[in-house]
């Protein structure tokens, strides 16, 4: 999937309530079924774990019950992973049966064994037409972070990302030493604990300990990202914290938002009880050719919070409806000329 300036304009106008459909030019790849596969490489098996259903949410808490290792709008989960095993053959996971299957495809062409491909299915119903490409690439960005962590466990890394209107290709390379001290079991625990919190009942934090649910990102803004393919990052991360009195602040930029202002923007969570609001901003001047990878990067950075800030009673909810243009232009004057708010993660602790 490729993202263009027209798509960004559609996304931006949507925040004003103006709806223009993002055009999806993706072409469907044709895979020929070969057979079911019983035993596969452990590394491949762990990669497919990322795409398995980990748990089912409670019906009295959320209408979006399916949970995997990454978030997906309305739990649609439209992404599929294919792994090259050579000679135009690919492994994938049948999400309905839970079995591994082998397919043949002659369209992709020659690629190294172990190359990963993410292919997007169509959203099953007519939702989010104005932001569907945005949501799709953000979701893939979340997946890419998980893949990078899992690769590290197996002494591998993402070398580069290639995008077209059929798939996202992820090229993998071996490394001598893992960067993170993380076992698969611990990674799996983070995945199981990941939640966006209840939707059908009010989230409360009567303790009002707003240090709970806070996450300080380990990834720095100036880190080199293979996901960008050496292009320039046009993304800025902005973290607002609950001051425990009347709203959320970012003291370095002298930004303050009241609970009332934030609750009027997004009323599914009461900001009086939330701890942190991490916003991801995109430069207005970004060249069209860099859009796809920078939006993937935003999803990648958001997943660090969604994954590593996961534990019992913690929630990390991705939010596309960040702040309205009026609030952005009035309260973020130091940033509004250069950036647009593109994505956010709302984090906190909730009482059972």
Mark where each language-model region is.
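N-terminal accessory segments that position/regulate proteins before the catalytic core
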Residues: 1-352
């Amino acid at each position: 999937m490729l993202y263009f300036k027209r798509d960004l304009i559609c996304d931006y106008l949507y925040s004003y309530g103006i709806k223009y459909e993002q055009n999806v030019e993706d072409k469907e790849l044709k895979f020929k079924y070969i057979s079911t596969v019983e035993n596969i490489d452990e590394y491949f098996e762990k990669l497919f774990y990322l795409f398995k259903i980990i748990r089912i949410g409670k019906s009295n808490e959320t209408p979006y019950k399916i949970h995997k290792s990454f978030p997906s709008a309305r739990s649609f989960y439209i992404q599929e992973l294919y792994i090259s095993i050579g000679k135009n053959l690919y492994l994938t996971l049948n999400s309905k049966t839970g079995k591994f299957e082998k397919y043949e495809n002659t369209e992709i062409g020659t690629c190294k064994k172990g190359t990963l491909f993410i292919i997007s299915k169509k959203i099953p119903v007519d939702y989010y037409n104005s932001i569907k490409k945005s949501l799709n690439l953000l979701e893939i960005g979340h997946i890419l972070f998980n893949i990078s962590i899992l690769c590290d466990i197996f002494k591998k890394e993402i070398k580069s990302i290639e995008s077209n209107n059929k798939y996202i290709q992820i090229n993998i390379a071996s490394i001598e030493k893992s960067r993170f001290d993380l076992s698969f079991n611990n990674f799996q625990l983070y995945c199981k604990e990941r939640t966006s919190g209840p939707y059908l009942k009010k989230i409360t934090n009567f303790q009002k300990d707003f240090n709970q649910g806070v996450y300080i990102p380990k990834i720095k803004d100036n880190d080199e990202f293979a996901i960008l393919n050496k292009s320039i990052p046009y993304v800025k991360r902005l973290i607002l914290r609950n001051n425990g009195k009347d709203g959320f602040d970012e003291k370095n930029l002298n930004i303050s938002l009241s609970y009332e202002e934030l609750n009027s923007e997004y009323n599914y969570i009461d900001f009086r009880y939330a701890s942190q609001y991490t916003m991801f901003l995109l430069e207005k001047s970004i060249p069209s050719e860099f859009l796809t990878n920078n939006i993937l990067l935003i999803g990648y950075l958001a997943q660090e919070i969604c994954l590593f800030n996961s534990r019992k009673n913690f929630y990390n909810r991705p939010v596309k409806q960040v702040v309205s243009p009026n609030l952005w232009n009035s309260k973020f004057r130091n940033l509004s000329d250069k950036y647009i708010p593109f994505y956010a993660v709302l984090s906190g602790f909730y009482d059972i």
